[in-house]
Amino acid sequence: MLPFWIALQFLSSLPVRLPGMPTPNEMGRSLLFYPVVGLLFGLLLWLASHLLQGAPAPLHAALLLALWVLLSGALHLDGLADSADAWLGGFGDRERTLQIMKDPRSGPIAVVVLVLVLLLKFCALWVLVERGTGGWLVLAPVVGRAAMLGLFMGTPYVRKGGLGAALAEHLPRRAAGWVLLGSVLGCVVLGGSPGLWMLLLSLGVFLWLRRLMCKRLGGTTGDTAGAMVELLELAVLVGLALMV
């Protein structure tokens, strides 16, 4: 179970303590549990939504979004901000794009992108809450983190050394394929027909984002992987909100 605790510590702000420094093999296996962490987030959001029944829909949605950000420690939002700055500031140049991603400061483009993504998530949550489909909240965190597993499974990691390189190098790919299949089937069971359409939409967004990464960088980084999580969660929420 150590790989699960590694995944939970890395992807969440929950107080998880590991018994020692994980080995590279344990780090790679932790990727297999990313969809499980997404499922945990989704269940916590669903429980919170159930407890907030009766609250005004805008406040209900805002509190869910705040909990969502707190659970992840804004980890993927940080990656989205860095990627937005780098993508527009890099002017198509690979090395310049990678250099800007290392800058901890956020420019106006990053701020605008974050505001837009959070605003769209809030509006989508509002619709889902108002129409009594809060149970579908489980789907978005699962899809986002399963996509990260899929990205590391089939995309080169462009930075040598560090956490991301260890994850990509030591990921057991056959097991990862089974985990992805289980995640897809689970989303279909939970979401029914809308869940299936949502998966097709997510696949399209995933392939498009991966193509952009490979064209610009020749692969992925931790920041672009985080950006993918946020954008896929957004696609799922908006897609479901439009279907209900």
Swiss-Prot record:
Catalysed reaction, written as an equation: alpha-ribazole + adenosylcob(III)inamide-GDP = adenosylcob(III)alamin + GMP + H(+); alpha-ribazole 5'-phosphate + adenosylcob(III)inamide-GDP = adenosylcob(III)alamin 5'-phosphate + GMP + H(+)
Group of enzyme by EC: transferase
Localization in the cell: Cell inner membrane
E.C. code: 2.7.8.26
Keyword Transmembrane among record annotations: yes
Keywords noted in UniProt: Cell inner membrane, Cell membrane, Cobalamin biosynthesis, Magnesium, Membrane, Transferase, Transmembrane, Transmembrane helix
Annotated transmembrane regions: 31-51, 55-75, 109-129, 134-154, 188-208
Entries under Pfam families matching the protein: CobS
Statement: the UniProt record of this protein carries the keyword DNA repair: no
Signal peptide coordinates: none
GO-annotated cellular components: plasma membrane
GO biological process, one term: cobalamin biosynthetic process
The organism's place on the tree of life at top rank: Bacteria
UniProt pathway: Cofactor biosynthesis; adenosylcobalamin biosynthesis; adenosylcobalamin from cob(II)yrinate a,c-diamide: step 7/7
GO molecular function: adenosylcobinamide-GDP ribazoletransferase activity; cobalamin 5'-phosphate synthase activity
UniProt cross-references to PANTHER family, sorted A to Z: ADENOSYLCOBINAMIDE-GDP RIBAZOLETRANSFERASE
Function: Joins adenosylcobinamide-GDP and alpha-ribazole to generate adenosylcobalamin (Ado-cobalamin). Also synthesizes adenosylcobalamin 5'-phosphate from adenosylcobinamide-GDP and alpha-ribazole 5'-phosphate.
Record-stated family: Belongs to the CobS family.
Protein name in the entry: Adenosylcobinamide-GDP ribazoletransferase
Source taxonomy: Bacteria, Pseudomonadati, Pseudomonadota, Gammaproteobacteria, Pseudomonadales
